[in-house]
């Protein structure tokens, strides 16, 4: 999860912007973890009741909550039925936490703005089993807005920036990975070779002509980043194919800033089966067939 949090911070900062222009169910972008310090960490901290009069020890029997370890997908919450068994039911959208920030809002494929991803998934859950619910997905982060059509010339430029951005994200993770465990040892070894290559094009707002020349000149530097990104997305399940749901963590933050995102991913699905295989993904980024290797998805 730490990798994805950092991943989206990179998305918000760089946004794959071109020189002429300024990150199952879709995954929520931010996970908030809080940890309560143990009693005794502060020298003056005492347990409640430390100075109370001694009383007879009585063993307290605490009933285990059946929902405690029962996981429900986004849009559902756990409830206990008449047999004290946990079950997942649709969450009431009105029970979602109130959000006021514009970046908390999300846009659905129904072109409707939802107050938060919680409100979106709760609404989607209530539509389960319907045609509308089947077609409804989280489209992008932020309120709905006009997304201009992607021209053919713009579509050819998109993978140039995306490829370069993937390479730079990996290099940044590598440089900041001393204690964060953002990359595995195998991944670090692959990125190290790219990082130490003096011919590497440094991060920056480059023209598409320069990006195209660099890809041709330093083609081998881009092979692993493309495979790595596929592996980051192929998670639910890990089956060698990317569904609309699995693409969401990458698509959702990009669409408001890169209007060719949707058309690009649609074009990657060469056989129109609603899934993008590794071969289709790599081909979309210009990786040659002989260089597509499942063992690089690590």
From Swiss-Prot:
Residues 66-88 form the Follistatin-like domain. Coiled coil: none annotated. Residues 1-17 form the signal peptide. GO terms for biological process: regulation of synapse organization; semicircular canal morphogenesis. It comes from the Eukaryota. This is SPARC. Pfam families: FOLN (PF09289), Kazal_1 (PF00050), SPARC_Ca_bdg (PF10591). PANTHER family: SPARC, SPARC OSTEONECTIN. Residues 84-146 form the Kazal-like domain. Disulfide bonds join 67-78, 72-88, 90-125, 96-118, 107-144, 150-260, 268-284. Residues 256-291 form the EF-hand domain. InterPro entries: EF-hand-dom_pair, Fol_N, Follistatin/Osteonectin_EGF, Kazal_dom, Kazal_dom_sf, Osteonectin_CS, SPARC/Testican_Ca-bd-dom, SPARC_FS. Keywords: Basement membrane, Calcium, Copper, Disulfide bond, Extracellular matrix, Glycoprotein, Metal-binding, Secreted, Signal. Belongs to the SPARC family. One of its GO terms (molecular function) is extracellular matrix binding. Detected in aorta, skeletal muscle, calvarium, vertebra, anterior limb, kidney, heart, brain, skin and lung. Ca(2+) binds at residues 269, 271, 273, 275, 280. The keyword Transferase does not apply. Appears to regulate cell growth through interactions with the extracellular matrix and cytokines. Binds calcium and copper, several types of collagen, albumin, thrombospondin, PDGF and cell membranes. There are two calcium binding sites; an acidic domain that binds 5 to 8 Ca(2+) with a low affinity and an EF-hand loop that binds a Ca(2+) ion with a high affinity. Its main location: secreted. It is found in: Secreted, Extracellular space, Extracellular matrix, Basement membrane. Glycans are attached at residue 111. One of its GO terms (cellular component) is basement membrane.
């Amino acid at each position: 999860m730490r990798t994805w949090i950092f991943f989206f911070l990179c998305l918000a900062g760089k946004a794959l912007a071109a020189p002429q222009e300024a990150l199952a169910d879709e995954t929520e972008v931010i996970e908030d973890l809080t940890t309560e310090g143990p009693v005794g960490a502060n020298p003056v901290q005492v347990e409640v009741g430390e100075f109370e009069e001694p009383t007879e020890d009585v063993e307290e029997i605490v009933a285990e909550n059946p929902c405690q370890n029962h996981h429900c997908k986004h849009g559902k919450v756990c409830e206990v039925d008449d047999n004290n068994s946990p079950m997942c039911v649709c969450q009431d959208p009105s029970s979602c936490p109130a959000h006021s920030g514009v970046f908390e809002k999300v846009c659905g494929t129904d072109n409707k703005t939802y107050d938060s991803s919680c409100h979106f998934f709760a609404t989607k859950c209530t539509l389960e089993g319907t045609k509308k619910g089947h077609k409804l997905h989280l489209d992008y982060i932020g309120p709905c807005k006009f997304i201009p059509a992607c021209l053919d010339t713009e579509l050819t430029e998109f993978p140039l920036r995306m490829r370069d951005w993937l390479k730079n994200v990996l290099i940044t993770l590598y440089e900041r990975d001393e204690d964060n465990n953002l990359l595995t040892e195998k991944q670090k070894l692959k990125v190290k070779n790219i990082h130490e290559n003096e011919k590497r094009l440094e991060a920056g707002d480059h023209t598409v002509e320069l990006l195209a020349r660099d890809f041709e000149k330093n083609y081998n530097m881009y092979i692993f980043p493309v495979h790595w990104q596929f592996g980051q997305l192929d998670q639910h399940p890990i089956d060698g194919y990317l569904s609309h749901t699995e693409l969401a963590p990458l698509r959702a933050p990009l669409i408001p800033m890169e209007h060719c995102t949707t058309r690009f991913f649609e074009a990657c699905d060469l056989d129109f089966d609603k899934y993008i295989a590794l071969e289709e993904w790599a081909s979309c980024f210009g990786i040659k067939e002989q260089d597509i290797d499942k063992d690089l998805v690590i």
